[in-house]
Amino acid sequence: MTPDDIAGFYAKRADLDLDNYIELDFDFECAGDPHEAAAHLCSEQSTAQWRRVGFDEDFRPRFAAKVLELSAEPRPSGFSVPVECAARGPVHACRVTIAHPHGNFGAKIPNLLSAVCGEGVFFSPGIPLIRLQDIRFPEPYLAAFDGPRFGIAGVRERLQAFDRPIFFGVIKPNIGLPPQPFAELGYQSWTGGLDIAKDDEMLADVDWCPLAERAALLGDACRRASAETGVPKIYLANITDEVDRLTELHDVAVANGAGALLINAMPVGLSAVRMLRKHATVPLIAHFPFIAAFSRLANYGIHSRVMTRLQRLAGFDVVIMPGFGPRMMTPEHEVLDCIRACLEPMGPIKPCLPVPGGSDSAATLENVYRKVGSADFGFVPGRGVFGHPMGPAAGATSIRQAWDAIAAGIPVPDHAASHPELAAALRAFGGR
């Protein structure tokens, strides 16, 4: 690129109508001049060629992505990980904020991702390592999306559960049980105090546990538990499947008693979820398979916060995400980034309920609550309820007992002295 070419991909905020731009934060490592590398990054994701041969024209003022901010630090030791790079020159670690005109692709998630996470970004000259750290949308862009139908307030209203976390449970054994014993486990967990008993993300519509039969039995169990406890309950059915079956499975599950639906967001596709949102009559709940493949590495891929924002944009009312436990291998600051992405203002898009999960139990509830900093979250044990030594009802009860202690300002171990279900949970799971 010539100096004039490079200059065409830089702008000041004051010179742009920011309502027309999505802002993107990237971290990248480059070989050669960082200013040229950042210009290439803008060019490749927008106007890779900005004029026709023989024409006096320039498409960059309207169509080019533009650098708003750039910082660069030399890396004398080279790239942070061994990587192929055809470019030569000093290596720099860079942080850039780019304004990308959303008129290039419109309010369409597949086209958005094709631009800001596509070939142009991950094959930009001189940049072998790059991570999209954040994405911010202007209000006119957000206005084209419906977002969550129910959001946090709607989910709480359905459960009549206010001023406390929402208590989920993953029915386990998660794979292998036929519908009848599976439903019995759900029933026990509801009577013990769960708000929502759910299918595992890997249990879908299979011949040995068909969704219609499973939903009918769990729907009946859910209604019985609600009547017996006097508290609303929800069965969360997994309808993850091929896109052309989503509306059919929605109708089957809801007609048979499911009060919410689980969809594995990235395997199914966010555009499919947006389509389903227009049809859905119950809350939609996201699970996180496939996301770590994008987000795990600190210097390459896509920050999971971006995925969280996109799931909210597509219409999920609840987003289950990797939580604070060591098994989840997610830095605490990244979990908190994702929680904020669910809760913070996003134009007309309703907040969605964050559910940080992974190997949780009554023994971890207080830690999760303190880290989140409010009661606006979901708590989703699996074995912490269904592997409780006294059974699923006691496992669910132990969760509620732990919350009662936290809400009353009583140390959880002290409360356990007079609550055997909680005491058993702390003994069984306290070392995790």
From Swiss-Prot:
Pfam families: RuBisCO_large (PF00016), RuBisCO_large_N (PF02788). Keywords: Magnesium, Metal-binding. Its cofactor is Mg(2+). Binds 1 Mg(2+) ion per subunit. InterPro entries: RuBisCO (IPR033966), RuBisCO_lsu_C (IPR000685), RuBisCO_lsu_C_sf (IPR036376), RuBisCO_lsu_fd_N (IPR017443), RuBisCO_lsu_N_sf (IPR036422). GO terms for molecular function: magnesium ion binding; ribulose-bisphosphate carboxylase activity. SUPFAM superfamilies: RuBisCo, C-terminal domain, RuBisCO, large subunit, small (N-terminal) domain. Homodimer. May be involved in sulfur metabolism and oxidative stress response. Does not show RuBisCO activity. Belongs to the RuBisCO large chain family. Type IV subfamily. This is Ribulose bisphosphate carboxylase-like protein 2. It comes from Rhodopseudomonas palustris (strain ATCC BAA-98 / CGA009). The lineage of its organism: Bacteria, Pseudomonadati, Pseudomonadota, Alphaproteobacteria, Hyphomicrobiales.
